[in-house]
Amino acid sequence: MGSFANGQNGSELGIQTPATGSNAALEPPTTSAAAPRCPRLGMAMVAARAAALVMALLSVSLMVSAKQRGTLAIFGIEIPLYAKWSLSDSLQSLVGISAAAAAYSLAQLLSIAHTALKKAPVVPSRRYAWMLLAGDQVFAYAMLSAGSAAAAVANLNRTGVRHTALPNFCKPLPRFCDLSAASIACAFLGCAFLAASAVIDVIWLSRL
């Protein structure tokens, strides 16, 4: 140390010192924060999306199988009836939106499985979490809207039209009405599970 006091520089001793005013050697290397894994939250996300997929598939399969023939007696006249989901615009919309929601849920489950194989976080970034939140809300509202429209048609078939001679169509067509009601119930349950997925997305956003 006395060599520095005698005016000798550090290069003569084989020592290199940082330049004056530079903090490069004093600052620790910066690393980007990794996304949290949250295994319990990831399991809840998988369960909610799997349930939404099952409900959407059930809604489609039940509605597609809803068709029946029967006869209706009005003023003693036998009128042949044929009921099928494709004859109603509202029921067609329910089938289409439920199929789209099933495809969306399946795609998300496959994405989660892919990230699990790579041992990466289920939700790697805030941007991805925002995309999930937007998709979940869109399909939840779409299924709610389609289910409500289909429920109005099913209720009209079951109660008939008041102040007219049109009676309850579900009496001669019980199978069609029961399958339609079950399909609509599954659609509402699928909407609920998609809404639960949206809540889980919000929790992910709060932790990223």
From Swiss-Prot:
Membrane listed as a keyword: yes
Side Extracellular, residues: 65-92, 150-183
Top-rank taxon, per record: Eukaryota
Keyword entries, A-Z: Cell membrane, Glycoprotein, Membrane, Transmembrane, Transmembrane helix
UniProt-annotated stretches for the region Disordered: 1-33
Glycosites: N157
Residue numbers on the Cytoplasmic membrane side: 1-43, 114-128, 205-208
Ranges that cross the membrane: 44-64, 93-113, 129-149, 184-204
Topology with respect to the bilayer: Multi-pass membrane protein
Biased composition, class Polar residues, residue ranges: 1-11, 17-33
Location in the cell: Cell membrane
Leader peptide range in chain numbering: none
Keyword DNA damage: no
GO CC annotations, alphabetized: plasma membrane
Pfam families hit by this protein: CASP_dom
Main subcellular location: membrane
Subunit structure: Homodimer and heterodimers.
Sequence similarity: Belongs to the Casparian strip membrane proteins (CASP) family.
The protein, known as: CASP-like protein 3A1
Organism: Hordeum vulgare subsp. vulgare (Domesticated barley)
Species classification: Eukaryota, Viridiplantae, Streptophyta, Embryophyta, Tracheophyta
